[in-house]
Amino acid sequence: MKTLLIHAKHFEYEAREKALDAAESIDGNRSGSFENALVVFVTVEKGDGSSQDVVEEAAADVLDVFRRVGASRVVVYPYAHLSDDLADPEEAKRVLSQLAERISSAGVPVSRAPFGWYKRFSVECYGHPLSELSRTIKPGRRVRPGYADFAVMFPDGRIVGIEELRAEELPEDFVALLEAEVFKKKREGGEPKYLEYCRKFGFEWEPMSDLGHMRYGPEATIMLDAVAEYAWQCARSLGIPVYKVRGTNTFNLSFKPVAQHAQLFGDRLYQMEVDEKKLILRYAACHQQFAMVKDWEISYRDLPFGAFEVADSYRLEQPGELLLCFRLRKFYMPDLHVFCKDLAEAMEVSFRIHSKIYEEIRKLGRDYVSIYNLTRSFLEQHRDYLKRLVEMEGKPVLLHFVPEGKYYWVINVEYNIIDELGRPREIGTFQIDVGNAERFGITYVDENNTRRYPVIIHTAIIGSLERYVFAVLDTAAKKARAGEVPSLPLWLSPVQVRVIPHSSEYLKLADSIADKLEEQGIRVDVDDREESLAKRIRDAEVKWIPYVVVVGKREAESGKLTVRVRGQGQYEMSLEELVGRLVSELKGYPRVSAALPRYVSARPRYSP
């Protein structure tokens, strides 16, 4: 049996004509209209009638959901479209009748729509986390309803089962996370607007490579360089020594630690054979950093410390899952591993990482909803630690329980934004790894001159470079949807200031302004094209250039510049005031060179 349970604010149906010769008699039951009803769409499958367990299990499940959602009645609605393995009509009618009777015997009002009729129906779903559920119940197999692998932890330390949740105490974004991760609800499709913005800045698929591989045009490369530098800056801000390293992306499976670590990622690894050697492309920076750090002589006095690399990473994602700037087969991961003396030190360091991850997403005007993947034993032994993490978030988190000993980590936190289309998208992450130090032979010498295995934190504070860009562009898409002007942060904009002279007569003045701005590390260009002023201003707006400076006779005589600030308006200010404003806005962010010709007229035409 397959069931689809909808908690409906309003539900109505009307039987129109017979679909089967064995259709039930109407007998005044041609239509029905109900408020606050739990509507149970039921497909009876072959063999359901041979086992009373099926009816008992289905009824128990319906009654459980009925009580939790606070419905006023149950409507059993025959629905043949949830399975291809249909019971014969007589068996189906018998099972449906038994199901309704079993629910009714529990004192619950039940209505049953007629079997074997074409029916019109309309439903208005409440839309809370328990309002759309589906079940599969097989003969001879008792299936306990519920979601035993999940729970929710609140900032006050309460842990609540999924079935006990109340929608009114949950933030909207968290409900979206529950619907996707627990109830597997699919959001409506459609092309997200951020893809248009990807094309605008030169983030594209490379058609001459494998699926899932990108290319980055000049503007996209400036943005990616800025994000890479910023990721390094974030890593260094944690208050511990961090060493930047580099290495290879190819590892030999004949080495036991490489092979063991590779097994954790299954069929998502790129593999190749060269000179009769089986090689893999790295999944992240783990292989290289661990292979390197195992050769270091480490004292307990050196801990904690980090190793950092922006690693070209390779994951053989399914073709249907690929999404530009988000789910890729090749991407850049600013991977930080923090080596700690023990689990206690790792948990203490993780608070800094947790705080930094939230600080960075909030700089974009966004917030996360989190999934804590962990074992039940870790929950029981470290409940206070988890409570502190959740308190720092200030909102509930989803706990996902995994089998003991299956993974190299004891906790894996996934930080999700809810995108423009209402879907969770993981950006940042951290894990506490208790297995890889021993696997790779990484040790340190403790206070008693004993060699020990460190505990390792894996983290990508701002996510992969591409996913951070995704978060920025999705934020712009949300702004556009809200009727605001979409924009990039100033530090990330490929061109931060464009100077537009009224005519060639003022090109020298435009150049002198650009010189002053470049001295401050500001990316500036000059639109010297023989186009109308209006067209050049419009082109700057199309390219989302944050500051546009127009210079002509008035500006030359007055010493005041006419400055258009994207999304804010037009201002008059001196060059010194403009520089001061830009320097202030860029404080704390990296300065990356423009790598573009100053004159717009000197550039070839390409998509951005």
UniProtKB/Swiss-Prot annotation:
Q: Please give the catalytic activity noted in the UniProt record.
A: tRNA(Thr) + L-threonine + ATP = L-threonyl-tRNA(Thr) + AMP + diphosphate + H(+)
Cofactor descriptive note:
Binds 1 zinc ion per subunit.
List GO molecular-function terms, semicolon-separated: ATP binding; threonine-tRNA ligase activity; tRNA binding; zinc ion binding
Positions of the UniProt region annotated as Catalytic: 192-489, 193-489
Q: Where in the cell is it found?
A: Cytoplasm
One BP term from GO: threonyl-tRNA aminoacylation
Q: Name the residues that bind Zn(2+).
A: 286, 337, 458
Q: Which domain of life is it from?
A: Archaea
What the entry lists under InterPro entries is as follows: aa-tRNA-synt_IIb, aa-tRNA-synth_II, aa-tRNA-synth_II/BPL/LPL, Anticodon-bd, Anticodon-bd_dom_sf, DTD-like_sf, Thr-tRNA-ligase_IIa, Threonyl-tRNA_syn_edit_dom_arc
Segments for region (Editing domain):
1-145
Q: Which cofactor does it need?
A: Zn(2+)
Functional summary from the UniProt entry: Catalyzes the attachment of threonine to tRNA(Thr) in a two-step reaction: L-threonine is first activated by ATP to form Thr-AMP and then transferred to the acceptor end of tRNA(Thr). Also edits incorrectly charged L-seryl-tRNA(Thr).
Entry remark concerning the domains of this protein: The N-terminal domain is an archaea-specific tRNA-editing domain that hydrolyzes incorrectly charged L-seryl-tRNA(Thr). Catalysis of tRNA editing is performed by the charged tRNA itself.
User: What is said about its interaction partners and assembly?
Assistant: Homodimer.
State the family it belongs to: Belongs to the class-II aminoacyl-tRNA synthetase family.
Q: What is this protein called?
A: Threonine--tRNA ligase
The record lists the organism as Thermofilum pendens (strain DSM 2475 / Hrk 5)
What gene is this protein a product of? Answer: thrS
